[in-house]
Amino acid sequence: MKGFAPISLVILVIFLFSVGVWSSEEADEGVAPMEKTEQETLYSAIQGFVGKWWNGSDLYPDPCGWTPIQGVSCDLYDGVWYVTSMNIGPILDNSLNCSPSAKFRPQLFDLKHLKSLSIFNCFLSPHKHPVPIPSENWWNLAGSLESLEFRSNPGLTGQIPTTFGSLRKLQSLVLVENGLSGGLPTNIGELVRLKRLILAGNWFTGQIPDGFGGLNQLLILDLSRNSLSGPLPITIGSLTSLLKLDLSSNQLEGQLPLGFGNLKMLTLLDLRSNNFSGGLTKSLEEMHSLEVLVLSKNPIGGDIKTLEWQNMEKLVILDLSGLGLIGEIPDSISNLKKLRFLGLSDNKLTGNLLPKIATLPCLSALYLHGNNLTGELKFSESFYHKMGSRFGAWNNPNLCYVSGMVPAGHVPFGVRPCQQGEEEVTLVEKPNSKTQLGDEILNQNSHYTTSLGISSFGIDGFWWLSGFLQLLMFLLLT
């Protein structure tokens, strides 16, 4: 046994030496240096946003070590700390908040390892203190920047600088609810690594550039709530990786492109509140992954039976309201077993309403008002209990309900009871004021969310749908 003592001693020495080396490496990483130039550059860039009172060297003498700055992240390069992420704005209680005189300082563009830049709720006054996005120096970040996000900055004005086209590593460009205007730069189409392009809620004008069709890795394209006009570019059919396409609330026009049929991965298409016309395109049938289709408030026209709706079996939300559609509601819609919301209001639809539509297992909101539907509502008592106020059929003069099939308290708003042997009938619960009717319409809008179990608290205008669609896309992508 004594012969094993030297061997044990050697093993112990090796073990202790290994632990010492490991501990030394950990310690070295913990006290890794930061270049003084990088440190001063960081302080100056932040000071431009939060104000001259902010003294970074006193408050955060070791910003990548034992005195970290909220919203700033660092990584090691060759044993030295460099800033890789900066988030400015009131995200958390101790976040860096902007001053009323916030501005971009040129030192921001000297952070040569910066991968992510986010500025939220910083530039707030478009009249007293408008701030344009700097037009120069973005090429200094061309080798590092992967994510650029400006949100809720109404005082951030002017155009998107063409120098954004130099950011060839960019994967996410998000410019939402700012005061930006002008046309969309064509060279954004050269950012071929982009996966998210979200430019919603600004004042952009002009047409969508053809060059956007070159973004073949794009997953989300959201240009909603701007003033874009003209037809959709044919090249949009080249975005075959797209999961979400939201072009709602613009002034886009023309026919729905045949290229839509190439978007096999698309789960959400929102084109509401534009000027599209020319009928429903058959290419919509080829979008087999589609779960949300919102075309409402467009003068599209044509026959609702143009499409074989059973081919879109994954649909959860279908809103065709306000399109000027004609014809009878097709039986094929009754094959959409996952459908939760169906909006067919304010069209020119005719014919009897098939009872089968009420048997859709997931349906929790059905709006048919403002058409020329006829005959009896032959829905079961359980249907009315299930729907409550989420069923709308008013303003169909020749439509009536069978009294014995409707439970007390669930009489369909604005629909007359079917009566035999009487020439005069009156509408039940006819709205006695514009306010009452307006409340019902508002109630319909809120059911995009409530019919799916999502609270409508805080909904304002079209924000209710945008918020829901964003939440739904988040769930789909994760």
Where do the PLM segments sit?
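Consensus "Asn ladder" position of solenoid repeat domains
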Residues: 122, 153-154, 178, 199-202, ...
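LRR N-terminal entry segment and analogous cap-like coil->beta motifs
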Residues: 78-158
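Tandem repeat domain/solenoid detector
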Residues: 169-171, 179-186, 190-195, 200-219, ...
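The feature encodes a structural signal of leucine-rich repeats
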Residues: 104-109, 128-139, 157-162, 181-186, ...
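LRR flanking "cap" motifs
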Residues: 48-102, 127-131, 302-309, 313, ...
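Membrane-proximal ectodomain caps of single-pass cell-surface receptors
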Residues: 263-267, 285-292, 296, 301-303, ...
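Surface-exposed cap/linker segments adjacent to membranes
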Residues: 2-73, 84-91, 121
